[in-house]
Amino acid sequence: MKKNSADYYQERNLKNLDRIDSLLEELPFFCEDFLRGVETRTSTLTRLNYVYDLRIFFDFLSRRKLRGKSIREITLDDLNEVTDTDIEIFLSYLSNYRFGDKRLSCDERAKARKLSTVRSMFKYFFNKGLIDVNNTAKVATPKLHEKEIVRLENSEVSTLLDTVEYGSGLSDHASGYHDKTKIRDTAILTLFLGTGIRISELVGLNNESIDFSNNSFIVTRKGGNHAILYFSDEVGDALAAYLEQKKNDPKVPDEEPAPLFLSMQYRRITVRAVENLVKKYAKIVSPLKKITPHKLRSTYGTALYRETGDIYIVADVLGHKDVNTTRKHYAAITEDNRRSVADKVRLHRPIDED
C-alpha cells in the first residue's frame, strides 16, 4: 500500500521539535526566545541538545545559587547575578551530579559542550541588551585531550566482512537470525567501510537514493545539505544483492519513499539497531577496540588518506566543513609509519660510522 508521508529527515525534525516544545515547559520562559533567535543557523538536533544542556544548567542554579526558586521562576535578572565563579562551580559540579533520580558524570568533552551552550545563551541575551553582563566569556574551556583514532586494520576489515557473511563466532541467539539478515548486514558494513558514510546518513537512505548507473548515492548532510557520494563496484555489488533480496520478499511494504535498510519488522532501521549490529560483529573481530559506526568511518578516512595523501579530498568526501577537523584526525603519522621507523634510530653504532 502506498504511503504518502514526509521523508525520514522531515519526520526526525518534527520529532525533535515536539520534544523541544515539551521540554521548554520545564525551562524559564526566556529559553523559548533564545531558541527562536538561533533557529535559522542551527538544526533541530542542535537546539534539542541546547535544551538538554540548559535543563541541567538551570537545575544547578535552582539547587545551588537561587535556592527557593523553581526553574520556571528564574528570570533574566537572575542571569545578571551569575558570576564567572558560578560557571566554574557548575563545570566542577558536572563531574558528579544528580539529575532527577539519576547520578551522572560528564567528561571534559561533555563539560565543554555544556559550557558552549550556556555561553551561546548568555551571548544572545547580552547582544540583545536584555542582560547587562556576560561572565561566561571569562571562563576557560575545559582542556580536551586529543584521542588517537580507533580504526580497523586492513586484515580486520576482511575478517569483519567474512564474519558477517559466514556468521562465525556469533552467539546461538544471533546465529538464529543470521541467514535472514546477513545480506542486509553485509550491505550496511560494506557501505560504511567503502564510503565513510555517517550513521544518520545511512539510516536516512531510500531506495531511490541509489544510482547504479553512476555508482553514486545522495545523502543529507548535517545542516540539511545534500551531497553525492560515489562507491566502488564492491559496494555496488553488496547493495544490489540486498535490493534483489528485498525485491523478492513479499513482506516488504510498498511505500514511498521506500527506506533502503529495513529492520526485522520491515520498518526503516533505526540508529540504535545499526549501532547494535556493528557492535555484534565487531566485538568478535576486535573486542578491545570497541568499534562503532563512527570508527568504521574513521577506518575509511584513514584508508583514503593513505591512498591519496590529499587531506582536502578526505575532508570533502567525509563532509567536513573545516579541513582542520580532517587534518587533526587523519594527517598524523599512521601506526604503520610509527612501526616502520621504530628501528631507524640506532643507539649502538659501530665506531667507524661516526
Whereabouts are the PLM-identified features?
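Conserved catalytic core of the tyrosine transesterase superfamily
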Residues: 1-354
